[in-house]
Amino acid sequence: MKLLDARKDHYRKLAHEQGFRSRAAYKLKELNQSYRIIGPGFYVLDLGCAPGGWTQMAIKLAGNQGKVMGIDLSYVEEIPGAEILRGDIEDENVVDDVMNYFERKVNAVICDLSPKVSGNWSVDHAKQISLNYDCTKIMDKVLAHKGNAVFKVFDGEYSMEFRDYVKKKFARINLTKPKASRKQSSELYYVCLGFIG
């Protein structure tokens, strides 16, 4: 078995053993260990949350005093400790639902979303970046001053343009790829710290 396959299986097995819905939960855990995106008591919004691995990890990281909401267009099975909303992030009206639930601005916005992939790389990349722009429109209205955000990005033609756009909104931005990501995957994560609006 190749080392890569072994690693992939390791995270999948770990997720199964520890009750997480996807291996992606470990990406957030690793990112949080490096950058402390989510702390105890944080209010966290997970955009594009299906199947729920990041939402589950966010609950764990935010603890009992925290509050977590996940939003996705797809049906997501209920997650104890989180509010799940079936909604479209391309519809800015979801902001009202977010604010009604949290009753104040959130400390972190996390986005690990992917479009339904077509197999045409340039189309999928453009759509994924477009969804991230939609996330920033929501983020601008719900993220507290000095809050944090994470965006998964399919690396490609529009990645740097998106990075430059987001960079203006935060004190610091880091580009990283967690070990739990597949090595051959084009996904990167923009970790954005200290929201300045």
UniProtKB/Swiss-Prot annotation:
EC identifiers of the protein: 2.1.1.166
Gene3D superfamilies reported for this sequence: Vaccinia Virus protein VP39 (3.40.50.150)
One MF annotation (Gene Ontology) recorded for this entry: rRNA (uridine-2'-O-)-methyltransferase activity
Pfam families: FtsJ
CC terms in the record's Gene Ontology section: cytoplasm
Family: Belongs to the class I-like SAM-binding methyltransferase superfamily. RNA methyltransferase RlmE family.
Function: Specifically methylates the uridine in position 2552 of 23S rRNA at the 2'-O position of the ribose in the fully assembled 50S ribosomal subunit.
Record-given protein name: Ribosomal RNA large subunit methyltransferase E
Lineage start: Archaea, Nitrososphaerota, Nitrososphaeria, Nitrosopumilales, Nitrosopumilaceae
